[in-house]
Amino acid sequence: MSVLITGVGVVAPNGLGLAPYWSAVLDGRHGLGPVTRFDVSRYPATLAGQIDDFHAPDHIPGRLLPQTDPSTRLALTAADWALQDAKADPESLTDYDMGVVTANACGGFDFTHREFRKLWSEGPKSVSVYESFAWFYAVNTGQISIRHGMRGPSSALVAEQAGGLDALGHARRTIRRGTPLVVSGGVDSALDPWGWVSQIASGRISTATDPDRAYLPFDERAAGYVPGEGGAILVLEDSAAAEARGRHDAYGELAGCASTFDPAPGSGRPAGLERAIRLALNDAGTGPEDVDVVFADGAGVPELDAAEARAIGRVFGREGVPVTVPKTTTGRLYSGGGPLDVVTALMSLREGVIAPTAGVTSVPREYGIDLVLGEPRSTAPRTALVLARGRWGFNSAAVLRRFAPTP
């Protein structure tokens, strides 16, 4: 059974919607800049990937506005766009034949911080009743399923930056178990003081003040990453079911998925990223020689970049495959990062061009990777590998294949 991606919805700092985002990525235009939603002058980090051109009332019903955090509003919008793109009308499909699987790493930080201020300053009676679910990691799954009447198997996953790929992998398993269509992906937003402090506490956030030089994975100047908001929601379908409803094309196939967990620090055992890569390739029934491009996790932290480069090198050989990190144009989007990379990979497969790693210029020779720099690289890729790692040991990998219509 093939699991196809038939629709995508993108909400990114450098583009709302697929076409603006893809154009920005190819041009190397980033959406990074100073945080403007609160005063960051007292904080060591001041840059983020903000979505500044999103006006929620233009995209979701007014009744949902008081119920939802910014991350959920973005997720609902992306889901709407993905379903429209897939030409899938939920009202014409059986409710139990549609599921929702999303990932979330931050929860409803903005909503909850606001309600906590009310609690502390005005008392418990001032707290919104919607706080009971607006903060929760599973809220995007719930709101999407309610909005579109999707009553099939649904769930939520939490694995920081790796969670979005995990969600897509679980959606694929759900389809293979008999659910014809699953809406899946990840969106995060935590650009409020409470969320900002939590992110800075990781010790991995860039303190640079120049957006052009703040997030440089695999570069000699790498010194942390820039966090961002947004992500992507995708429509995944069983190929036969998609064709039965009249959908005869797709962005590509989700051919393989795998997740691993790193051993305890100091154990002496190897990290799990290489194993995740090999498991995903095995799941896809393909070998390293068939992979045409790797969309790397690209932590932007020197020791993490070096570890990822070693894992890629052990699987593919020194400079054995083109590698790219288009997320330098958006920042790291936590659960939204993996699904957005999947969309970028699918577009690369469809358009025959590998998106570049914007901003990076000086890759240490010892990394031994063929990083795509400066300009898009025109090729004819057929298979892509997407990687993601989350704090505390999460590793995920996904294999994508170019769509091949049935003769």
UniProtKB/Swiss-Prot annotation:
Q: Which keywords label this protein?
A: Acyltransferase, Antibiotic biosynthesis, Transferase
Name its GO BP terms in alphabetical order: antibiotic biosynthetic process; fatty acid biosynthetic process
According to the entry, every stretch annotated as the Ketosynthase family 3 (KS3) domain falls at 1-402
E.C. numbers: 2.3.1.-
Q: Name one GO molecular function term.
A: 3-oxoacyl-[acyl-carrier-protein] synthase activity
Domain of life from the UniProt record: Bacteria
UniProt KW Acyltransferase keyword: yes
Q: Does the keyword Iron-sulfur apply?
A: no
InterPro entries hit by this protein: Beta-ketoacyl_synthase, Ketoacyl_synth_C, Ketoacyl_synth_N, PKS_Beta-ketoAc_synthase_dom, Thiolase-like
Question: What family does the database annotate?
Answer: Belongs to the thiolase-like superfamily. Beta-ketoacyl-ACP synthases family.
Q: Which PANTHER family match?
A: POLYKETIDE BETA-KETOACYL SYNTHASE 2-RELATED, POLYKETIDE SYNTHASE-RELATED
The note filed under miscellaneous reads: This putative ketoacyl synthase lacks the active site cysteine.
Q: What is this protein called?
A: Actinorhodin polyketide putative beta-ketoacyl synthase 2
Q: Mind giving the lineage of the organism this protein is from? A: Bacteria, Bacillati, Actinomycetota, Actinomycetes, Kitasatosporales
